Regions:
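Active-site-proximal alpha-helix that buttresses catalytic centers in soluble enzyme cores
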Residues: 1-77, 81-86, 110-111, 116-149
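Glycine-rich phosphate-binding loop signature in dinucleotide/nucleotide-binding domains
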Residues: 45-47, 94-99
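Generic beta-sheet signal
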Residues: 3-5, 96-105
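A broad, low-specificity signal for short, low-complexity segments enriched in glycine/proline
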Residues: 12-14, 93-96
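...with weaker cross-activation on analogous glycine-rich loops/strands in unrelated enzymes
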Residues: 83-95
């Protein structure tokens, strides 16, 4: 049994869209909230039990709330899109006791992980995700989460 970590890019940014905002420009659009909610409902049909985390950005926190219907655990370190991110992910995985983990993060974090672990370019769209697992000693990046499966 491994801890599985799903790292999602946040919903549609309000400051880069002409769509109506859910709150202010630092958050996500109303369309972003609807898509996050739809994605969360779909996800919960496959993975009913999971813990939800978010970086400290308004857009990731809003996405996490609409995705899960719960307040996420907010961690500033989930915005560190460099080698420090691995320490944060390992810490979350160790404390999870083999539960599924969903993390709302940023496109540059996902791009960093794909480049660093797989040597691949990854330009995630809103709500695209990568899957990792923690085998008790190390983090392994499995690839892109196929939402259509």
């Amino acid at each position: 049994d491994n801890t599985v970590i799903f790292l999602f890019r946040h919903g549609e940014r309000c400051d880069r869209s002409d769509m109506p905002c859910y709150s202010d420009k630092s958050g996500i659009t109303i369309t972003g909230t609807e898509k996050a909610q739809q994605e969360g409902i779909k996800f919960a049909t496959i993975f009913s039990e999971y813990d939800i985390y978010s970086s400290n950005a308004v857009r990731t926190i809003q996405t996490a709330k609409f995705f899960s219907g719960k307040d996420p655990v907010v961690m500033d370190s989930l915005s560190d899109c460099n080698n420090d991110l691995y320490k944060t992910l390992e810490s979350i995985a160790r404390e999870s006791h083999k539960r599924n983990i969903v993390i709302m993060t940023h496109n540059h974090c996902l791009s960093f992980l794909a480049r660093d672990r797989l040597g691949k370019k990854f330009k995630p769209a809103y709500l695209d995700a990568l899957i990792m697992h923690y085998d008790g000693t190390r983090l392994i990046l499995d690839g892109k989460y196929n939402k259509e499966a």
